[in-house]
Amino acid sequence: MGLEVVVPRVASVELAALLDGLGAAGLPSALAMVDNVLQGPGAIPPAVWRDARIRTPAGIVTLRRVPSGVAVVVFGNADDALRAAQRTIAETLLALH
């Protein structure tokens, strides 16, 4: 079971812009997987996606499109550092729109 934060009404978000925003917010991150396809270093993120995994220094965070926006999900046993990364990603998503 995961811990989920839903960022409401985020219609579309460019993953490259999100990664740039996270770097500016002090959370250097990389794209690990998009729609069940592994992403290598330097891979260009697709413009359209349903599910993405973001690698942060604290661990992996899942982004999943839901009808009400984008869900930012971590494992239920996430430590404080991973929960902080989850909040930073949610805040950055909100700031992009």
Predicted regions and their residues:
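Low-complexity, compositionally biased segments
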Residues: A17, G23, L38-Q39, I54, ...
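Ser/Thr-rich, low-complexity intrinsically disordered terminal regions
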Residues: P28-T56
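Low-complexity, intrinsically disordered/propeptide-like segments
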Residues: L22-A25, V34, P41, A85, ...
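Generic detector of ordered, mature protein regions
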Residues: L18-D20, L31, D35, V74-G76, ...
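Feature targets compositionally biased, intrinsically disordered low-complexity regions
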Residues: M1, D20-A25, Q39-P41, A58, ...
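Short, extreme N-terminal segment that most often corresponds to the first beta-strand
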Residues: M1-L31
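Charged interaction segments
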Residues: A47-H97
